Each structure stands twice: as C-alpha cells, then as structure tokens.
Amino acid sequence: MLAMTTLDTLYPPTAPLDTPEHNEFRATVRRFVEEEVTPFHTQWERDGQVPREIWKRAGELGLLCLTVPEEYGGAGVDFSYSAIVVEELSRAGATGPIFYLHSDIVAPYIVQYGTEAQKQRWLPGMVRGEIIGAIGMTEPGAGSDVAGMRTRAEREDGANSPQGPGYRINGQKIFISNGQLCDLLVLAAKTDATRGAKGVSLLLVDTHLPGFGRGRRLEKMGLHAQDTSELFFEDLRVGADALLGEEGRGFVQLMEQLPQERLLVAIAAVAAMESAVIWTRDHLLQRQAFGAPLSDKQTVRHRLAQAHADTRVARAFLDDCLRRHLAGTLDTATASIAKFWCTEMQFRVLDECVQLFGGYGYMREYPIARAWADARVQRVYGGTTEIMKEIVARELFGR
C-alpha cells in the first residue's frame, strides 16, 4: 500500500488545494479511501462493479456532488474540493468508484440547465448516493462524431395518451460508465434528424421506466471495477418535463460542459503519475541486482528522475489550469491541452515505471500493472488525443 506520508513529502498539496480547509477535507477523503475502498477494491474488480453501498457511504460522508447548492443538499463549495476526491482515489489506484462522473459531469448539467422541478427531483438523491448518474453520448457508430448519433427522441403531442406530451426514445448507447448501476441517465438524442448537431437534445431518463434495457457488462483491458455497459431504448416514453434545457441545444450544452470533464481526466492522470513514481522508487530501493539495489544503477536512477521531472511539470501545468477553471477563465483549447498532454504523459510515465519494475510490473497483483492498464483509456474517453489536438489546431489557425 502506498505510504501517503511519503507521497505528500515528494508531491505535497499545492495551490489552490493547500488551504487548511482543503487539507482537512483531504484527510477525510483519504481515510474513507484507505478504510472503505482500498481493502475491497480487488474484489470489486472481480465483480466488475462497485456495490451501491459504497455510493451511499460516500454520500453520508458528504463526498458526492460537492458543488451542488445547499438548497438541494450539496455542500455548495467550489470545484477544488471535487479535485481532491479525484486525486485521492487516483493516487490509491482506486479507479472503480467513478464518483466524478456522477458528481462533476452529470450533476452540473442539472444544476446549470435543469428546471426547479428537475433539480428537486434528482439532485438530493444524487448527493446522498441513493441515485447514481450516468451520461449517454457514445453510440456504436458515433463516438467523437456527436452529430452522427442515431438514437431518436421523437416528440409526441400526447393527444392519444393519458401521459400527455413527451418523447418516445429508440436507439442504443455503448461504453457507458455506471451503466449497470445508474438510476438517471443524461441522454443525448436526436429530436430533429434533419439538423445534424443542431438536432441534438438532452433528456433526463429514469432508467426504471419501461423500454430501458441494460446490455452486458463489457469486459475491458483495464478499469475492471468500473461497470461499463451497452444501453438500449425501445419505445421508452418520457414526459415533456424530461427535456433538459431547450430542444436542439444539446450539442451546445455538451460542449459547454466538456472543459470540466477534460480537466477531471487530467487531474486523475497526474495523481496516478505521482503514485507510480513513488511505487517505482520504493521497488528500486528494495530490489537487488548484481549485489546492489537497482536504485544504485545510474541508468535506472536517471530514468526515474526523468519520470519524476515529467510529473512535476504536469502538476505545475495542471495547477494553472485548475486556477483558471476556478476563476471561470479556462478556455476550451487549454482544457483540451490539459486532457491530451497529461494523459499522454501519464501513459509514458507509467510505461517507464512498468519497465523499471521488470517482470513484476506485468503482474496484476502489483498496483503499477493495474495502473498501466487503467491508464490506456484516458487518451480515448472524454475526447481522444486526436480530437483534442484538432481543437487546439483550430485555435492556432482560426479554422
């Protein structure tokens, strides 16, 4: 298990996450992870998902939906506290409880675009961990190409239905995190198939309604404790009050929220890098070769020194992005740089650490092996590296 005191010495909390209030909150999160997550994570990996009870426990401790206003049960604090939850889970290699998807991706859609009735219905339960949220964007034939999605939400006037006006949903989503557990899905669907991206709308779907189906739990290279699933919609009917925001504004809403999503991925990436360097350093100090610790070999020392330097640089850039986000000035291009650069660096650092572990680095009983496998998808979800670079290129060239 990672010695957190050692990690805090080499990678201490930095501004804007280093106030006494932040340190006190970090201690609470760390205690929760050490006592109620880490001892059970291997079993959750075998099960393919995290039990609902851990969500409720996180809710009891006030670790979910921290930025949700107090009138809906949240703490009403800023995003910096959410960043601490992401860091502590990632540092521990606890990639199963994907709280940030629920708290910092799904909940903000409702806070920002939801009606008062929608907020009252969904947010208190999400804060308590009784309602688990997910987001449905990706389809078998539409990943980065949101405009190409085929899931339809056809408007019905309700003249012949006792349920009144609403939408009838048909289609399929894939690679949906929290797919097996979710009670609420922020669904992106076409309400006007003739308008491309301008025909996309967001709807709040209660997954207990008739017509909603969960496919198999997908077997992944990594993230074994995260439930990732296919979802199906067959004549699923929701009321008109399920529309989130305005019809045809879904693509714009998704784009407005993506900078925070990409920053979350970058936060997890850098925290994982920091732990990987510590794990590798400790291994090199203990592992003997040719009568001396591997840490005495200059080539080995220099390779880990480079990984440490890369990690320090990533942290400095990430902290700058976090400060910008808290000030409301983090632009889309900078968030895209943070996402692709930090995740590319994460995989490079972790790959180097696996190499320095030798054969042990390929054994899943070692956290470095699991972290390496978990890291690979970071360059894919939340926007691929290639799409991130295209966003940056458009800013550079104006097109």
Named regions from a protein language model:
Residues 150, 166, 170-214:
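A short core secondary-structure module
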Residues 104-113:
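Helix-loop "lid/cap" segments that line or gate small-molecule binding pockets
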